[in-house]
Amino acid sequence: MAIEILSDGAVVRTITHVLTASLCDKLDGTLTFDFTALQKGEPPILPGMTAKYDGQYYSIVRVKRGFSAGLEISAVSCEHISYILNDEQYNLVTFVFEGYPAEGLQELLQNTPFTVGVVEPAAMVECAFTDESPLNRRAALMRFVEQ
C-alpha cells in the first residue's frame, strides 16, 4: 500500500508503510480516506495537499500531528477530490439533459477543474434535475451516473 502526497501536482512524498488506514465508501456517495503515518524526518503533510491512493485522489482536509511511543506521527483525514464540486461556486440552478453519457458528463463538468475520461455506456440518456435549487453539482453528478 503506497500513498503519494502531492503539492501543486508534484509528488513531495511517497509513504510505503502506514500505521493505520481506513477507506469509507458508502452508497450515498461518501468517499473518505484516513491514514496515520510516521513523520520522522519527512516533509510535513499539510491540509490543502493531495493524497493519491489506489488510483484515486483525495484532498487532505485535516492533519493531526502528535507522538505515539515516542515517535512523531501524522493522522491525516481526506475527502475524495470530487468533494470540490460541493463548493457553492459550482452549484447549478437546474440540469436538464438528453443525449449521450459522455456529452452529459462534459456538460456537468463544464467550468470545473475536472474533465471527462473514458465513458463506456453509449446509449442515449435523459434526465431532469429540477427538484431543488440551487443544485449541488457533485450530487447532480452522482445522480447522473446512476441513470
Region spans (language model):
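Charged- and aromatic-enriched interaction segments used to assemble
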Residues: 73, 79-147
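Assembly/oligomerization scaffold segments
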Residues: 1-94, 142-147
